[in-house]
Amino acid sequence: MRDTAFRSIKAKAQAKRRSLWIAAGAVPTAIALTMSLAPMASAQSSNLSSDAVIGSIAQGVTDGLTDYLKPRVEELPAGEVTYPEIAGLPDGVRVISAEWATSKHVILTIQSAAMPERPIKVQLLLPRDWYSSPNREFPEIWALDGLRAIEEQSGWTIETNIEQYYADKNAIVVLPVGGESSFYSDWEGPNNGKNYQWETFLTQELAPILDKGFRSNTDRAITGISMGGTAAVNIATHHPDMFKFVGSFSGYLDTTSAGMPIAISAALADAGGYDANAMWGPVGSERWQENDPKSNVDKLKGKTIYVSSGNGADDFGKEGSVAIGPANAAGVGLEVISRMTSQTFVDRASQAGVEVVASFRPSGVHSWEYWQFEMTQAFPHIANALGMSTEDRGVECAPVGAIADAVADGAMGTCLTNEYDVTGGKAQDFANGRAYWSANTGAFGLVGRINARYSELGGPASWLGYPTSSELKTPDGRGRFVTFEHGSIYWTATTGPWEIPGDMLAAWGTQDYEKGSLGYPTGAAVEYNGGLRQQFEGGYVFRTSNNQSYWVRGEISKKYAEDGIFAQLGFPTGNEKLINGGAFQEFEKGNIYWSASTGAHVILHGDIFDAWGAKGWEQGEYGFPTSDQTAITAGGQTIDFQNGTIRQVNGRIEESR
């Protein structure tokens, strides 16, 4: 089973010679060749050398056996997208967008100068006090993915509870997305459709983004699993001034000893069809030495180094085990390689006088549940290295008063903070959201995407004010909404969360809210020619420049949205009116008329409009317009109707039927 004991170099000096290179005898021939048996089954019978063990295991992982390590393909939840403008970044680097999956989980899409071929995603889990301490800076904890990293999101957020674990801690958790088989390294050249330059991106491009745009205090820890563990140590040795802590969970910390180049080459070929020569050049070259953790361990002196590994023994079903199922055969062999190479690294560190917190477990295989466990075991050492206070490592908290009553059903989860002051009232953070209280509104808890949008707008300090309800289900069952002092936020899975000002909400309500022809909002209310415009699934709601609110829907709204039409018509002066055979809507400078046979068309106030009106409007001789009113080259205006044309030429009305 996994134990929780940690041994420093000094503590295990006497046992140093129990190198896992010698202990390779604990790996049976059957494992080395077929990776099908538990490693302790014939511990006394195998006399394989370490390079033979590694080479044989490598041979076994070349046929897709590491597919089990590929995280489930899960898209991140769609969120509100913002477009941060961060000054002072390196040339060619910018944050294209920031998508808020929750109020504490943001997905950055970054244009990289080092890897310009495609945008790069990075997930950030924001600190506990991100909102309650808006002027504070926080340390960073990087968590690198494994060999089978996918492009949708980090394996850490798919396969572990990292988001929940760090929710009550005051650190920015940094999760690069993608990088399959990259070792997060700068590659020698393009390969397999990729031109990996991950180390440059992470250290020269991402770090300034966090510093200048996300309130980093530049104190950093870097960790990783498997391939990411190797990368974490390599990046830290190449940039020792950037990191105070480096952690490897089942990493390969010896890349050049006999058998390891073969193993790495086999792994890259298996996980995506990559050529290791494109990564660090020919085996034995200077680049391989530069990316050999054991050879550069002296550069980490003075830093906190955490190294962990199992030994390949399947402990599923045993007391204290964190395993969620029987071991995968490849997971056994890969963990054996990790154990042997990690031991070599620790031994080399001892020779160099570099202290390592080594946590070698008496069991465990190459799998996510073990790495989740190591994440929790490493955190106290991370916190010490980053100088985090006791309060920043977690909280002892409890809801009180009205907020306690509002969250009594447990839906908000455990508290992450105590109650704190916000503009005009109080707030308290919980695992699933945030609760708000003011004397005028009482206390309500908000969760999910609506809470994230409210937080992004500024929470109680925004124009919405305080919530006056918790999250409610819409009558049509499709969405959710929360009411506030000065408006509401409505959400559906397809439209996202959007806030509606109170007066525009009232106008929308005349169409039966989301059940009516306008449907749900699809964007925020935006400034529009001295007023506001908000788009809905079936039209728009406008606030005019004199603070009147009206809706425009259907074909009339489509016509009104065409280029140049607003300049012709101005704001609506009323809502759509149904008439015999169709509908029309009045605007400041004219009307739009619609019928099923003619479509929607514009007619302007003036002599043509008056002449048409004298003949009974759309119910009279001419019928509905069949074209928009337009200018003519001779100087004047013209418009066609179902039964004729009316023109104004040089101030004179001409009618033809």
Swiss-Prot record:
Per the record, GO CC terms? extracellular region
Which positions make up the signal peptide?
1-43
**What Pfam families does the record tag this protein with?**
Esterase, LGFP
Xref: InterPro entries: AB_hydrolase_fold, Esterase-like, LGFP, Mycobacterial_A85_antigen
The protein's predominant localisation is: secreted
* Gene3D superfamilies noted in UniProt: alpha/beta hydrolase (3.40.50.1820)
Compartment(s) of residence:
Secreted
| Gene Ontology terms for molecular function | acyltransferase activity, transferring groups other than amino-acyl groups
Q: Which UniProt keywords apply?
A: Secreted, Signal
Which PANTHER family does the UniProt entry name for this protein?
DIACYLGLYCEROL ACYLTRANSFERASE_MYCOLYLTRANSFERASE AG85A, ENTEROCHELIN ESTERASE-RELATED
What is the annotated role of this protein in its UniProt record?
Answer: One of the two major secreted proteins.
Q: What is this protein called?
A: Protein PS1
Species in which this protein is naturally found: Corynebacterium glutamicum (strain ATCC 13032 / DSM 20300 / JCM 1318 / BCRC 11384 / CCUG 27702 / LMG 3730 / NBRC 12168 / NCIMB 10025 / NRRL B-2784 / 534)
Source taxonomy: Bacteria, Bacillati, Actinomycetota, Actinomycetes, Mycobacteriales
